[in-house]
C-alpha cells in the first residue's frame, strides 16, 4: 500500500496541480525548480519505492562500503516538502493513466493499490530499469542487480558471507562496485561481453588505461567473455559461473550490471512517441505537446551547441537529470527555454576518479596526457581541430579546463596540450 509524507494531499476527488511520476533526481529537481520559478499549485511527487527520494551514485561505492549512512543519501527533509507544498507518495506504482477528454493535459493516474491521482499537468521522470541477464540460474539467490536502495541493501547483506564475487558488465556501475568489493577484501572477477571496458562512454585509450589500472589493483578482468550458466550449490545458492568455453569460476555473489532499459511503459499507455526512451523536443515536451519528460528516460535533441538538428541522444547522468529538469520546469511555467549545454559525467572506481566533459562521438584526433609521476591521465578528443570532449582520470584540473573551453565555445591547442607539464587552462583560446 502507498504511504505519504510531506504536505497534505488534495482532498478526495480534487486534482493536484502537477503529478510527477518518478521520485528520481529529475523528479526532485523538477519540483524544486518549479517552486523557485513561482509555481504556486500543489505538486504530488510519486515513486514506487518505500523510501524518501535519495541519491543513487553512492550505492555502489561509499554506502556499500559503510562509509556513509542512509540519511546522507536523502535529498530533502520532510519539512522541506511540507514547506514547499509537495506531497510525497511512496510505494506506489502507476499502472494506467486516463486522459481528460476535454483537457488532454489533465487526467487521472491509477495506482497498483487502486488509488487514483487526478492531475492538471503530468510529468514523467521515471528513469530506467536494469537490463536482465537471460541465462540458466539467473534468478538464483546470490544473483543481484544494483539500481536502487533495496538492491544495494540486498547486496550489502550478502557481502559478509562471500569470498568470491563475479561482476557481469564492465561499465560504470560494474566497475565501481567491483572496485568497492575488492577494497572490502573480496576476490572479484569482472566479465565483459565486449572487447573493451566502458565501451559506450570512453575511447580506446581510456578503456585501456582502466583495464590496466584495475588489473594492477588485483581485479581479474576478462574481455569478450560470455556466461553460459550460473550454477547452484546443494542449497540452491550461487556457487559458480560457467562460461561458454566451459570454464567454471567460483562465486557466492553474481552482480549484474549490463546496462539499463528506459521505462517507457506509461508513455506507451499515453500514446507518446517512444524510441530508445520517450521522445521529447528541446523543451522537454513529449509528442502530445503537453506531457513533460525529463532525465534518463528522455530521448532528446543533442544539447551540445552546434550539433546537427536531427541528432538525438539519451543521457544517463546526474548532471543531465538536474539540468533537463530545470528546462522542464520552464516549460511548465510557459517559458520557452531550450536544453543546451555541455554534458559531463563522473565515475569513482576505487582510488580513480574519472571525469568526462563533452561527448566524444565523431572525433578524428586524440591527445593523451599521462602524468605517471602524479598518477594523472587524460585523453582530449578533437574533431576538425576543435576540442569536443575529454576523459580525465585523477586529473580534475584538466577536466575543469576542458569544461570551461567547451562551455565558452573556445579551443585548447592540441600541440600544446600534448605537454603534460602545461596547464590546459593556459591554452584556452
For every predicted segment, state its role.
Residues 1-21, 74-166, 242-244, 255-257, ...:
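FAD-binding core/adjacent interface of flavoenzyme oxidoreductases
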Residues 2-17, 23, 36, 297-398:
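Mid-to-C-terminal Rossmann-like scaffold of FAD/NAD(P)H-dependent oxidoreductases
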Residues 3-87, 180-201, 401:
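Beta1-alpha1 glycine-rich phosphate/pyrophosphate-binding loop at the start
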Residues 17, 239, 249-273, 352-429:
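C-terminal catalytic lobe of FAD-dependent flavoproteins
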Residues 23, 46-48, 148, 170, ...:
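Cofactor-binding loop segments of dinucleotide-utilizing enzymes, especially the Rossmann-like FAD-
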Residues 24-28, 50, 128-130, 150, ...:
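Residue-level detector of alpha-helix initiation sites
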Residues 40, 82-111, 117, 184-280:
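A Rossmann-like FAD-binding core segment of flavoenzymes
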Residues 139-160, 237, 242, 246-327:
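FAD-site-proximal beta/loop scaffold in flavoenzymes
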Amino acid at each position: 500500500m502507498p504511504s505519504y509524507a510531506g504536505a497534505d494531499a488534495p482532498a478526495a476527488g480534487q486534482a493536484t496541480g502537477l503529478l510527477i511520476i518518478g521520485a528520481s533526481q529529475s523528479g526532485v529537481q523538477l519540483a524544486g525548480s518549479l517552486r523557485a520559478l513561482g509555481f504556486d499549485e500543489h505538486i504530488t511527487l510519486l515513486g514506487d519505492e518505500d523510501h524518501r527520494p535519495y541519491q543513487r551514485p553512492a550505492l555502489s561505492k561509499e554506502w556499500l562500503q559503510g562509509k556513509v549512512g542512509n540519511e546522507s543519501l536523502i535529498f530533502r527533509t520532510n519539512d522541506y516538502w511540507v514547506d514547499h507544498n509537495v506531497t510525497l507518495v511512496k510505494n506506489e506504482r502507476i499502472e494506467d493513466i486516463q486522459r481528460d477528454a476535454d483537457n488532454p493535459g489533465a487526467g487521472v493516474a491509477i495506482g497498483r493499490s487502486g488509488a487514483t491521482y487526478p492531475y492538471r499537468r503530468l510529468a514523467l521522470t521515471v528513469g530506467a530499469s536494469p537490463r536482465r541477464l537471460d541465462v540458466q540460474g539467473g534468478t538464483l539467490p546470490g544473483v543481484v542487480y544494483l539500481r536502487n536502495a533495496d538492491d544495494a541493501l540486498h547486496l550489502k547483506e550478502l557481502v559478509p558471507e562471500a569470498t568470491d564475487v563475479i561482476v557481469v558488465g564492465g561499465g560504470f556501475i560494474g566497475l565501481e562496485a567491483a572496485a568497492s568489493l575488492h577494497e572490502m577484501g573480496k576476490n572479484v572477477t569482472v566479465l565483459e561481453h565486449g572487447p573493451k571496458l566502458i565501451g559506450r562512454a570512453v575511447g580506446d585509450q581510456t578503456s585501456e588505461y582502466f583495464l590496466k589500472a584495475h588489473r594492477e589493483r588485483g581485479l581479474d578482468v576478462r574481455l569478450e567473455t560470455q556466461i553460459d550458466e550460473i550454477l547452484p550449490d546443494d542449497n540452491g545458492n550461487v556457487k559458480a559461473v560457467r562460461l561458454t568455453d566451459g570454464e567454471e569460476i567460483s562465486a557466492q555473489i553474481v552482480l549484474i550490471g549490463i546496462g539499463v532499459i528506459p521505462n517507457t511503459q506509461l508513455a506507451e499507455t499515453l500514446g507518446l512517441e517512444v524510441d530508445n526512451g520517450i521522445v521529447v523536443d528541446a523543451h522537454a515536451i513529449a509528442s502530445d505537446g503537453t506531457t513533460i519528460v525529463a532525465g534518463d528516460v528522455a530521448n532528446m535533441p543533442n544539447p551540445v551547441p552546434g550539433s546537427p538538428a536531427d541528432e538525438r541522444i539519451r543521457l544517463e547522468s546526474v548532471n543531465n537529470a538536474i539540468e533537463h529538469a530545470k528546462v522542464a520546469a520552464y516549460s511548465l511555467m510557459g517559458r520557452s527555454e531550450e536544453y543546451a549545454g555541455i554534458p559531463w559525467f563522473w565515475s569513482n572506481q576505487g582510488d580513480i576518479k574519472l571525469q568526462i566533459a563533452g561527448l566524444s562521438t565523431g572525433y578524428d584526433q586524440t591527445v593523451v596526457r599521462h602524468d605517471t609521476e602524479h598518477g594523472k591521465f587524460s585523453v582530449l578528443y578533437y574533431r576538425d581541430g576543435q576540442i569536443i570532449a575529454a576523459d580525465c582520470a585523477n586529473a580534475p584540473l584538466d577536466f575543469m579546463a576542458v569544461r570551461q573551453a567547451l562551455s565558452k565555445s573556445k579551443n585548447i591547442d592540441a600541440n600544446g596540450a600534448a605537454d603534460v607539464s602545461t596547464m590546459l587552462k593556459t591554452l584556452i583560446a
